[in-house]
């Protein structure tokens, strides 16, 4: 039987007060989708995400002018805030100094290994981890053009080079992600990452997964495989939808796999010719009412004598 327990072999890092890796439960994340200048809007979204069960929140920091807003959000946020940085090592350094609980940098656009040195120094001084976040759509051009490697191998090669560089600089609080938009590539990549770097905590996800229905199917199929095999220390289900739906999806998947429970599980039959009641609207109404209940209970709604009372 595959191992569904949290991966105790990975190095544990702290994101604020949240333990990630080292046998800790898989941490649920989401990402804010408002401009940083809307401080109150972002804080309101963080509060809603926290109520939904989010444990770590990420926010894009695209411009130097955003840093003051970012700092204010970090100070007032009830959740640890991860700074999502692309294209600028300087922004990563400043975000570390201004309250980020963790940095996310992209090897494909941060400016090369040497540009990462001051970022590592800033993170070490702040006592925060860094996620090396590789994406299939933004691989380093030299690596992307190699014909001797498959796409999963390219993603793993990029991540491995940066992790080894970080370790060589004496920085070990590293988390890795390597995402693609399709499930087979995602699963193959994370399996290979887990084999190549078993001690490094992994942030799992299917990037650009799509709108609610498609995104849920793709993410559940891909992440479900990985989590069932004990791969994944933290997760985000990326959806083109309200971020709270991402959090609900994460908890539903973790619950379905028997890994973590915080909300009710609705058990309802699909209906057939034996159904004695108009079950579909009843089940939908029960599901709606259960949204505000946060207890790991089971609630059954059945429509005939085969599966249960009507």
Describe each PLM feature range.
Residues 90-131:
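Hydrophobic or amphipathic alpha-helical targeting/insertion segments
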Residues 15, 22-41, 60-62, 79-87, ...:
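Active-site mouth loops of central-metabolism enzymes
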Residues 64-85, 118-130, 192-202, 286-290:
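Alpha-helix-loop-beta-strand connector modules within alpha/beta enzyme cores
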Residues 53-55, 98-113, 206, 229-243:
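Glycine-rich phosphate-binding active-site loops on the catalytic face of alpha/beta enzymes
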Residues 33-42, 50-77, 104-112, 174-183:
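Glycine-rich, proline-tolerant flexible connector loops at the mouths of alpha/beta enzymes
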Residues 10-12, 25-29, 56-58, 80-84, ...:
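Structural preference for beta-strand elements that scaffold enzyme active sites
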Residues 134-135, 143-301:
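Catalytic alpha/beta core domains of metabolic enzymes, predominantly
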Residues 1-31, 36, 124, 288:
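N-terminal amphipathic alpha-helix/helix-capping segment at the start of soluble metabolic enzymes
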